[in-house]
Curated annotation (Swiss-Prot):
Annotation: DNA-binding region: 351-370
Recorded GO CC terms: cytoplasm
Region (Disordered), start-end ranges: 48-75
Source species of the chain: Nostoc sp. (strain PCC 7120 / SAG 25.82 / UTEX 2576)
Subunit structure: Interacts transiently with the RNA polymerase catalytic core.
Gene Ontology terms, MF aspect: DNA binding; sigma factor activity
SUPFAM superfamilies (UniProt xref): Sigma2 domain of RNA polymerase sigma factors (SSF88946), Sigma3 and sigma4 domains of RNA polymerase sigma factors (SSF88659)
InterPro entries given in the database record: RNA_pol_sigma-70_dom, RNA_pol_sigma70, RNA_pol_sigma70_r1_2, RNA_pol_sigma70_r2, RNA_pol_sigma70_r3, RNA_pol_sigma70_r4, RNA_pol_sigma_r2, RNA_pol_sigma_r3/r4-like
Superkingdom: Bacteria
Region (Sigma-70 factor domain-3): 237-312
Keywords of this entry: Cytoplasm, DNA-binding, Sigma factor, Transcription, Transcription regulation
Region Sigma-70 factor domain-4, residue ranges: 325-378
Protein name per UniProt: RNA polymerase sigma factor SigA
Length: 390
């Protein structure tokens, strides 16, 4: 995983077996049903809305009254918008397994068309016209446009039918710096990406696959947008050293080290250690209750040093996408990057070592590497990998 991330860093510098199912009428599947709707329970909607608070009665004057009216209107507008949205998505029928598979097939067909378009755009050095695109996939223009239309409708249907999953996941991340409305918006972007990446032939349900993408989008947005106090870089480095030292001492002593022991190993005073811990809001106990109901523990939200199932999914997805991008390079360019970044054996080789393998000079290997990285920075290629950049 580290080797793959090294490639990403270089690119972005400066700049279940599936059962046979009968075919489904897509026109029936891709329309909004008017009957047999699943209605949302209005009684559950209020739990997603932030509680209203009374204005301080001590405030007086026109300015305070005007401010209260503006805030009240804005709050009611937001709550009404969320309420309406939840009611609307509650009316969307959930997909059956066979419908999910059929939609996934149509989306895969759409993505194949879009890959052809990307290659054509790179070749022409401009956006291709529909007629050129249709010719590239060997279809008459009307048939091509219908196929494209069906694929896009299938993607929209897959996303719309799983919006309740976004709400369910977003609810778990409330009161962490982003409004519920923003959490839904970020989660929906993750859902769209999941629909674009889903491979139904691998045998898992779309909801299982989409959950990872939704969580990733939400947690990344929280990390990027919700921190109001940003610490200096050097302080982050010290915090990281404290964590590593604490872990090392725990392994050496077979118990949790004291503040004095950590400070001694770090060669700093206890006062400084406590100050840094307070600045970073490091928890004294991972059992500290979190949230209004105090039904969660701080430890639930601390990243583990071990590889979680989500980490494994991310690792596999990155490997697959990186392989696809590397396949677009020439064999020599691909081999040079594999050796340079240790993608096969985990060992990064020097320019001299690679030059000896190919019987060329160090400078020639540097040129090949630079050319390969320039190609990977092309928008048609780096768009595939950009989602992994934090």
């Amino acid at each position: 995983m580290n080797q793959a991330n090294n490639v990403l860093d270089s690119i972005y510098q400066p700049d279940l077996e599936i059962m046979n199912q009968p075919e489904i009428e897509l026109d029936d599947l891709l329309i909004e049903e008017d009957e047999d709707l699943l209605l949302a329970d209005d009684g559950d909607i209020d739990e997603f809305l932030e509680p209203q608070t009374d204005e301080d009665d001590a405030k007086s004057g026109k300015a305070a009254k005007s401010r209260r009216r503006t805030q009240s209107k804005k709050k009611h507008y937001t709550e009404d918008s969320i309420r309406l949205y939840l009611q609307e998505i509650g009316r969307i029928r959930l997909l059956r397994a066979d419908e999910e598979i059929e939609l996934a097939r149509k989306i895969a067909d759409l993505l194949e068309l879009e890959r052809v378009r990307e290659r054509l755009s790179e070749k022409l050095e401009r956006d291709p016209r529909d007629s050129e695109w249709a010719e590239a996939v060997q279809l008459p223009l009307p048939a091509f446009r219908y196929r494209l239309h069906i694929g896009r409708r299938a993607k929209d249907k897959m996303v719309q039918s799983n919006l309740r999953l976004v709400v369910s996941i977003a609810k778990k991340y409330m009161n962490r710096g982003l409004s519920f409305q923003d959490l839904i918006q970020e989660g929906s972007l993750g859902l769209i990406r999941a629909a674009e990446k889903f491979d139904h032939e691998k045998g898992y349900k779309f909801s299982t696959y989409a959950t990872w993408w939704i969580r990733q989008a939400i947690t990344r947005a929280i990390a990027d947008q919700s921190r109001t106090i940003r610490l200096p870089v050097h302080l982050y480095e010290t915090i990281s050293r404290i964590k590593k030292t604490t872990k090392l001492l725990s392994q050496e002593m077979g118990r949790k080290p004291t503040e004095e022991e950590i400070a001694t190993r770090m060669e700093m005073t206890i006062e400084k250690l406590r100050f840094i811990a307070k600045s970073a809001q490091l928890p004294i106990s991972l059992e500290t209750p979190i949230g209004k109901e105090e039904d969660s523990r701080l430890g639930d939200f601390i990243e583990s040093d071990g590889e979680t199932p989500e980490d494994q999914v991310s690792k596999n997805l990155l490997r697959e996408d990186l392989e696809k991008v590397l396949d677009s390079l020439s064999p020599r360019e691909r081999d040079v990057l594999r050796l340079r970044y240790g993608l096969d054996d985990g060992r990064m080789k020097t320019l001299e070592e690679i030059g000896q393998i190919f019987n060329v000079t160090r400078e020639r290997i540097r040129q090949i590497e630079a050319k390969a990285l320039r190609k990977l920075r092309h928008p048609n290629r780096n768009s595939v990998l950009k989602e992994y950049i934090r």
